[in-house]
C-alpha cells in the first residue's frame, strides 16, 4: 500500500475516533441535562424557601438539597474528564464540557465541602437576621431592612447615623469575622484544586476566553482593563467628591474637613455604596421641579405590584416578552414583616423548568422603581437563553447579566420617560438647570459607586492572594478606602471587625467586580441601542422605550447566553470587543464641565491624614526596650487590652470622684487608631454604649493624671517610657522650678546690660588716656587769639558744661 493511502487511512481513523468521542460526549451531555434539570430545581426551590422564610427546618432542607446537587455535580464532573477537550470540534459541546470539568466546591473533601456550606449558610443567616438594639431599651431592636436602612437613607442626625453605622458592623461584622477567615482558606483551597492561583483568580476566570481567534481574553487582562479605565474615571469622580464634600459641610458644618475624606456614615446608605439619597442635600437648582418622583408615586398610590407592572410594560414596549404567570404567583415583592423572616436584598431567580421569580422588599420610591427594572432585566436575560443547554444558561459574563437591567434603568430615569408614565407633570420643561439636576442625580448613583466597587474587589483579590496578612485586614481596608475612595472611618476599627462582610455580596459569596464591568457595558450597550432606536441628541436624553429595533438588537445578544465568547457577543452589539469608558464619560460630559466650574475655588481631591475623631485623640508612645532592657516584654493584643482597660479604669475613677457619676466605662469604649509596630498609637474615649458621644480630650487628660501611678505600675514603666503626647506633664505632677522663670530671665538680661556698661566705661577711659598722651607735646589751643574775642575751650567754666557719656 502506498504512503498516500496510509496517510488517508490514518486521517479517516482519526476523524472516526474524534467523531466517536464527540458523539459519546453529546450523549453524555444529553443525559446530564435531563438529570440536572430536576436536581437543580429541587435545590433552587429549597434555597428559595429558606430565603423567603428563614427557619431551622428550611435551613436543613436547603442543606440536604444542596448536598444532593453537589454530589451529583462532583460525580458528573469526574465523568466529564473522560472526554479530552482537544478532540472535540463542536464549540457547543466543548463549552459544556469545559464548564462541567470545573469541579467547583465539589473538589474539596466531603467534610470540608460540608463545612464550607455551613459557613456560607451561617454567614447568610447572620446577615439576614442581624439586629441592633437600643442600648437604653434592649427590647427596641432594628433589622437592617427596613429599620437601619431607613435611618441611613433619611436621617440628617450625625450621631444617629453613626450609631446605626457602627452598631451594624459591631453586631454583624464581628460575628462574621471568624467565619470569613475560614471561608477565605476553604475557597482558596477549592480554587487551587481547580488550577487557579486563588479564589480571586477563580472569579476572574468568568471573563476568560480561550481558543477563539481574535476574541481571546485573559484573567490578567481583566485586571489591566479595570485599572486603566478607573484612571480615566477618576477626574470625574474627584470633582463629584469635592462638590458633595462642600454640600456635606453645609449639612454637618463641624464634622467635615474642606480638604479631607468623607465620613463613611454620611453617604446615603449603610455602606456608602450608592450616594443616591444625598440628592436632596446636593441638588444644584433646588427651585426646579423635583426629578426624584418618589412623592409623585406616593401621591398616586403606587404599590409594589404597580412598580413591577410598569417595568414589565417597558420591556414589552421594546419587543421582549411578558413575565410568566408563575412569576406573578410565586415572586415575593413585599416585606413579609413579622409573619416570617426573609432576605430582603433584591435578587432575581431562575429556578429552572421555566420558573422565574424576584425576591424584593419593595418600597414605594424612585430608587426601588429603577431597581425593579434592574431585577426584571435579569429575568429577561434568563428567559431569553432558556433554550440553551443547561450548562450554557448564563450571561456571556457576570457583568453582562448585571448590565441588562441597568440599560433599562437609564431610559426609565429620563424626564421624558417619567413624563410619559405620569410621574412628572406634562408641563415639566427641560432646560440647562434641569439637565444638571438630572445628571447629578444619575452621577450620585452611577459614578459615586465605581471607586467603592473597584476598591472592595481589589481588597478581596489581595486577601485571597495572601498580600494582606489576616492581622491587618481592617488596617488595609481603611487605608485603601481613604486612598482610593476618599472615604474615612468615623470611628477606628480593630481586627475584631470584618467591615467588608457587612455588605450582602461579601457575606453571600458574590464576585463584586461585575458591578464595575456592568457599568461600562451598560453605557456601551445604551449608546448602541440608542443608535438602533434612531435617537438624536445627547446620550443622557435617550429613552429606548417603544423601539422594537433596539429590543431586537438586545434580544439577539441575550438569547446566546454563554454559548458564544462575551467578546464576540459585545462586538455584535457595540462593534467593539473590549470594555470602553468613553460612552460613560460622554454621557456625563455636561455635568463634568459644570462641576469643574463649581469647584474652581475648592480643593479637588482629598488628604488621607484627616479623621473625624482626630481632635479628641491622644497620641501614646511606649518605649519598653529603653525602660526594661533585656527584660522588655512583647507588646501584643493582650498588652493593648490591658492599656485600654487601664484607661477605662481611670475614666471610671475620674467620673466617680470628680463628677460623682458612676459611669461603667469598658475597654471597648477606648478606641485605638494608627497603631505602629514601634508602639505608638492614638486613642480616644466614647461613652459606654454610645459611640457617637466622644468624651472631650480635656476630661480624658484629667482622668489619666488622676490615675497616673496605677497606669505606670501596670506596665512597669514611668513617665518617660510611657508617654502621652500633648499632656504636659504627662503622668507626673506639674514640675515647679525653685525660682520663677520670669525672675531668672530678668536676672540674665540685667547681667548682660551691666557687663555691657562696664566694658563701655573701660574702653572710654582707655581711649581718653591715649588722646591725652598724644597731645602732651604741644599746646592744642596756641592758635586761639583771646584778644579778638575767640573762645578757648580749654578754659571753659565748668558750670556751663553738660557732662554725658
From Swiss-Prot:
It is found in: Cell membrane; Cytoplasm; Cell projection, Cilium; Apical cell membrane. PROSITE patterns: COLLECTRIN_LIKE, PEPTIDASE_M2, ZINC_PROTEASE. Binds 1 zinc ion per subunit. One of its GO terms (biological process) is receptor-mediated endocytosis of virus by host cell. A motif (PDZ-binding) lies at residues 803-805. Its EC number is 3.4.17.23, 3.4.17.-. It holds the Pfam family Peptidase_M2. Changing residue 239 to Q: No effect on interaction with SARS-CoV spike glycoprotein. Changing residue 92 to Q: Increases slightly the interaction with RBD domain of SARS-CoV-2 spike protein. Optimum pH is 6.5 in the presence of 1 M NaCl. Active from pH 6 to 9. This is Angiotensin-converting enzyme 2. The gene is ACE2.
Amino acid at each position: 500500500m502506498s504512503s498516500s493511502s496510509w496517510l488517508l487511512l490514518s486521517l479517516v481513523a482519526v476523524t472516526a475516533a474524534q467523531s466517536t468521542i464527540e458523539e459519546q460526549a453529546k450523549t453524555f451531555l444529553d443525559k446530564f441535562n435531563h438529570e440536572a434539570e430536576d436536581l437543580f430545581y429541587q435545590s433552587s426551590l429549597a434555597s428559595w424557601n429558606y430565603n423567603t422564610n428563614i427557619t431551622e427546618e428550611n435551613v436543613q432542607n436547603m442543606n440536604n438539597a444542596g448536598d444532593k446537587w453537589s454530589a451529583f455535580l462532583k460525580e458528573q464532573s469526574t465523568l466529564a474528564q473522560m472526554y479530552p477537550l482537544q478532540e472535540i470540534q463542536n464549540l457547543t459541546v466543548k463549552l459544556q464540557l469545559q464548564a462541567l470539568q470545573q469541579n467547583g466546591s465539589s473538589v474539596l473533601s466531603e467534610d470540608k465541602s460540608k463545612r464550607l456550606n455551613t459557613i456560607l449558610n451561617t454567614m447568610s443567616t447572620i446577615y439576614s437576621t442581624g439586629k441592633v438594639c437600643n442600648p437604653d431599651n434592649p427590647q427596641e431592636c432594628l433589622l437592617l431592612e427596613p429599620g437601619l436602612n431607613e435611618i441611613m437613607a433619611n436621617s440628617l442626625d450625625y450621631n444617629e447615623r453613626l450609631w446605626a453605622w457602627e452598631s451594624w458592623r459591631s453586631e454583624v461584622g464581628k460575628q462574621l469575622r471568624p467565619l470569613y477567615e475560614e471561608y477565605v482558606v476553604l475557597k482558596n483551597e477549592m480554587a487551587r484544586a481547580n488550577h487557579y492561583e486563588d479564589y480571586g483568580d477563580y472569579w476572574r476566570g468568568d471573563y476568560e476566553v480561550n481558543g477563539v481567534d481574535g476574541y481571546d481574553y485573559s484573567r490578567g487582562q481583566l485586571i489591566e482593563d479595570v485599572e486603566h479605565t478607573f484612571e480615566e474615571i477618576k477626574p470625574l469622580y474627584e470633582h463629584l467628591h469635592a462638590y458633595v464634600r462642600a454640600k456635606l459641610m453645609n449639612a454637618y458644618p463641624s464634622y467635615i474637613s474642606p480638604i479631607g475624606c468623607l465620613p463613611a456614615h454620611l453617604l446615603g446608605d449603610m455602606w456608602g455604596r450608592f450616594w443616591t439619597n444625598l440628592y436632596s442635600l446636593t441638588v444644584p437648582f433646588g427651585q426646579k421641579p423635583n426629578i426624584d418622583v418618589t412623592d409623585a408615586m406616593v401621591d398616586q398610590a403606587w404599590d409594589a405590584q404597580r412598580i413591577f407592572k410598569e417595568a414589565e410594560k417597558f420591556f414589552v414596549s421594546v419587543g421582549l416578552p411578558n413575565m410568566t404567570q408563575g412569576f406573578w404567583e410565586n415572586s415575593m415583592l413585599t416585606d413579609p414583616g413579622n409573619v416570617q423572616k426573609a432576605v430582603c436584598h433584591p435578587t432575581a431567580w431562575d429556578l429552572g423548568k421555566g420558573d422565574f421569580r424576584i425576591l424584593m422588599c419593595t418600597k414605594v420610591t424612585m430608587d426601588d422603581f429603577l431597581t425593579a427594572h434592574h431585577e426584571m432585566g435579569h429575568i429577561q436575560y434568563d428567559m431569553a437563553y432558556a433554550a440553551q443547554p443547561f450548562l450554557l444558561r448564563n450571561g456571556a459574563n457576570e457583568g453582562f447579566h448585571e448590565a441588562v437591567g441597568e440599560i433599562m434603568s437609564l431610559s426609565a430615569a429620563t424626564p421624558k420617560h417619567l413624563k410619559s408614565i405620569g410621574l412628572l407633570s406634562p408641563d415639566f420643561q427641560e432646560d440647562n438647570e434641569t439637565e444638571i439636576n438630572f445628571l447629578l442625580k444619575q452621577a450620585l448613583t452611577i459614578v459615586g459607586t465605581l471607586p467603592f466597587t473597584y476598591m472592595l474587589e481589589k481588597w478581596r483579590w489581595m486577601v485571597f492572594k495572601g498580600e494582606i496578612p489576616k492581622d491587618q485586614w481592617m488596617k488595609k481596608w481603611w487605608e485603601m478606602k481613604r486612598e482610593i475612595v476618599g472615604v474615612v472611618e468615623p470611628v477606628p476599627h480593630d481586627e475584631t471587625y470584618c467591615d467588608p462582610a457587612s455588605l450582602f455580596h461579601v457575606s453571600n459569596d458574590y464576585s463584586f467586580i461585575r458591578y464595575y464591568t456592568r457599568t461600562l457595558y451598560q453605557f456601551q450597550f445604551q449608546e448602541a441601542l440608542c443608535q438602533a432606536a434612531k435617537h438624536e441628541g445627547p446620550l443622557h436624553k435617550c429613552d429606548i422605550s417603544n423601539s422594537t429595533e433596539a429590543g431586537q438588537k438586545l434580544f439577539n445578544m441575550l438569547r446566546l447566553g454563554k454559548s458564544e465568547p462575551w467578546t464576540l457577543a459585545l462586538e455584535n452589539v457595540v462593534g467593539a470587543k473590549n470594555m470602553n469608558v468613553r460612552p460613560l464619560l460622554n454621557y456625563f460630559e455636561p455635568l463634568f464641565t459644570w462641576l469643574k466650574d463649581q469647584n474652581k475655588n475648592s480643593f479637588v481631591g482629598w488628604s488621607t491624614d484627616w479623621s473625624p475623631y482626630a481632635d479628641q485623640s491622644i497620641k501614646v508612645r511606649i518605649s519598653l526596650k529603653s525602660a526594661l532592657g533585656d527584660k522588655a516584654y512583647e507588646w501584643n493584643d493582650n498588652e493593648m487590652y490591658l492599656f485600654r482597660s487601664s484607661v477605662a479604669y481611670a475614666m471610671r475613677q475620674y467620673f466617680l470622684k470628680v463628677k460623682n457619676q458612676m459611669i461603667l466605662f469598658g475597654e471597648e469604649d477606648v478606641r485605638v487608631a494608627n497603631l505602629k509596630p514601634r508602639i505608638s498609637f492614638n486613642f480616644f474615649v466614647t461613652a459606654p454604649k454610645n459611640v457617637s458621644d466622644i468624651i472631650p480630650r480635656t476630661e480624658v487628660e484629667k482622668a489619666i493624671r488622676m490615675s497616673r501611678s496605677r497606669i505606670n505600675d501596670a506596665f512597669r514603666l514611668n513617665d518617660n517610657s510611657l508617654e502621652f503626647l500633648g499632656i504636659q506633664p504627662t503622668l507626673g505632677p506639674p514640675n515647679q522650678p525653685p525660682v520663677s522663670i520670669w525672675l531668672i530671665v530678668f536676672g540674665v538680661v540685667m547681667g548682660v546690660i551691666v557687663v555691657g556698661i562696664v566694658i563701655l566705661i573701660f574702653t572710654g577711659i582707655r581711649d581718653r588716656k591715649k588722646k591725652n598722651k598724644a597731645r602732651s607735646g604741644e599746646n592744642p589751643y596756641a592758635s586761639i587769639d583771646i584778644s579778638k574775642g575767640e573762645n578757648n575751650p580749654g578754659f571753659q567754666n565748668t558750670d556751663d558744661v553738660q557732662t554725658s557719656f
